[in-house]
C-alpha cells in the first residue's frame, strides 16, 4: 500500500520528468499549451438564446438524442397537478410568444427538477406563476413548428447530454457563458450584479491575447436599458450602478446606461472596457458580407422578440 507521503513524492517525481497532471491531462501533450489545433477556423460566432428544456424544443427529434418517450406518435410523459391528477404533455398550439410563461427562477426551476424526478413542471406553474395555465409547463413543439432548429439539429453536432451551469434563469447562465462563474448570482436581480469575477471574463482574455472581438446587439440599447431599469428592482439597481459609475469616470454614466443588456454587461463593472466593442446588428451583417468579422462575435438578438 502506498502511503500519503509516498504518493506525494511519486507525484513530484512525475512532475520533474514532465509528466505532471497538467501535462498528462492535455489532449495533445506533445504540443505546447495554446497551440492552434484547428487553424482553419477563423471566426467564432456565439448566439445564446433563452431558457428551454431539451424536450420542449427537440423532444420529438427522431433518431438522435434522448427525447420524449412516444407511443403511437404521442409523448407519454405526465406530471401531477396540485390535486394529484396527471397532466399529459401537450403540443403547443402556436409558436407565438405568450404573455405569461412558466417561471425560470431558481425556486421555480428547482420545483420543476424535484430532486431529479423532473415531474414538477405543472406544480411549478401553479405555485410560481399565478394566472398561468398550468398546462403551459407541459407544452412541446415539433419539427413542423420549428423547422429551422430541427434542421440545425440534424446537420450539426447536438449536445444531447448538456446541462445548464445554473439551474435557474437568464442572468446567472449568461454570466457563466462569459466567465465560468455567476459569482454567486442565482436569479435575475440586477442590484446583485455590481461585482466582478476574480479571474475576469472571456473578454479580458481576448484583450490580453490581442484577439479581436465584438458584441453585436439587436435592439437599440437605450430601450433595453429602460426595460431592465423599469422593473421592481430597477431603481435600486440604477442608484447602485450610477454611484459606481460616477466614482469611476464622472460623466460617463449616461453613456454606459444607454448600452445595458448586451452580453458584455452581465458584469457591469467591466462594461467600461467593452464600450468600444459594442455595435448594432447591422454592422454584424455588413462585416459578415465583407468577410471582415472579428475573431469572436457575440450576437444578442432583439429581446423584444422574446423566445421564452
Predicted region positions:
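N-terminal pro-sequences and low-complexity stem/linker regions of secreted or lumenal proteins
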Residues: 1-308
